[in-house]
């Protein structure tokens, strides 16, 4: 007869457990089993994790932990890991990915304690798979800085990276970030994914001007994954420029569209304006 291990406690160690990013149905069977069998849960917000555990019918000791916790707090958890199975979770998604945890994992490994991962949902990866942007190479850069100057400086440093770029963003800051990307990383496709795995999930892809116009008319809500395609391999040809011009004309006057495409491509603004007038007639 096969022995049922589900009721047995886990071996001592740190268990990095991914949790849903919006849809509770996305939690894995292994994550549920780990949370059920562990001795305690280190979490970013005890209220958020408490709700998840209640939904799963699990009662556990919750220890608040984030990367602002001092060294003494980490020392206590590391000491406990030598004798107990401790699950590490964030409010949503995979711990350590723009969420607390790396200092705790580092300290546990430095102490030669067992560390394992129970993988699952990650908003950055979910957004990339929906975006339609190249996914063979990508760089996740967390949240863009709040201040405009720092935001532009960060984008300038990332401009040469030959990969799709992934950021997290909030609804109120999206337009400012789109404007900065349009300025610092011109002629690149941008994708905005929001409310991932939820009822009103949305993913839009386009150039900066078109996306800014859309979100000015439809202020976004919820958490956002903001993605930027890699640098173009070569200067756009006339066909590419016309496609950009057609898209820009959906939200701009001919003169504005010509200026936008000229800035992005380096093509002559007068020629683009003449073509824009032809396309409008």
Curated annotation (Swiss-Prot):
Lineage, uppermost ranks: Bacteria, Pseudomonadati, Pseudomonadota, Alphaproteobacteria, Sphingomonadales
Pfam families associated with the record: RsmI_C, TP_methylase
Signal peptide as annotated in the record: none
InterPro entries for this protein: 4pyrrol_Mease, 4pyrrol_Methylase_sf, 4pyrrole_Mease_sub1, 4pyrrole_Mease_sub2, rRNA_ssu_MeTfrase_I, RsmI_HTH, SAM_MeTrfase_RsmI_CS
GO-annotated molecular function: rRNA (cytosine-2'-O-)-methyltransferase activity
Highest taxon listed in the record's lineage: Bacteria
Chief location bin: cytoplasm
Organism per entry: Erythrobacter litoralis (strain HTCC2594)
Swiss-Prot/TrEMBL keywords: Cytoplasm, Methyltransferase, rRNA processing, S-adenosyl-L-methionine, Transferase
Protein name from the UniProt record: Ribosomal RNA small subunit methyltransferase I
Keyword S-adenosyl-L-methionine: yes
Sequence similarity: Belongs to the methyltransferase superfamily. RsmI family.
CDD domains linked to this entry: RsmI
A GO cellular component entry from the record: cytoplasm
């Amino acid at each position: 007869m096969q022995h049922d291990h589900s009721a047995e406690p886990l071996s001592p160690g740190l268990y990095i457990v991914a949790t849903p990013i919006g849809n509770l149905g996305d939690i894995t069977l292994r994550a549920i089993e780990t949370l059920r069998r562990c001795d305690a849960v280190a979490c970013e917000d005890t209220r958020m994790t408490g709700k998840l555990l209640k939904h799963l019918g699990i009662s556990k000791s919750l220890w608040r932990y984030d990367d602002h916790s001092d060294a003494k707090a980490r020392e206590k958890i590391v000491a406990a890991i030598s004798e107990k199975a401790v699950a590490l979770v964030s409010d949503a998604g995979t711990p350590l990915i723009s969420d607390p945890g790396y200092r705790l994992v580092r300290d546990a490994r430095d102490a030669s304690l067992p560390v394992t991962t129970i993988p699952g949902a990650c908003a950055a990866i979910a957004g990339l798979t929906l975006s339609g942007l190249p996914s063979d190479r990508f760089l996740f850069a967390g949240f863009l800085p709040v201040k405009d100057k720092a935001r532009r400086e960060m984008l300038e440093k990332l401009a040469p990276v030959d990969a799709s770029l992934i950021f997290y963003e909030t609804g109120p800051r999206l337009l400012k970030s789109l404007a900065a990307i349009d300025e610092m990383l011109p002629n690149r496709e941008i994708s905005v994914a929001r409310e991932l795995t939820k009822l009103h999930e949305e993913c839009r892809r386009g150039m900066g001007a078109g996306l800014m116009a859309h979100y000015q008319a439809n202020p976004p809500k919820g958490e956002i994954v903001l993605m930027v395609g890699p640098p173009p391999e070569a200067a756009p040809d006339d066909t590419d420029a016309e496609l950009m011009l057609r898209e820009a004309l959906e939200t701009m006057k001919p003169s504005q569209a010509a200026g936008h495409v000229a800035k992005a491509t380096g093509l002559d603004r007068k020629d683009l304006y003449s073509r824009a007038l032809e396309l409008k007639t």
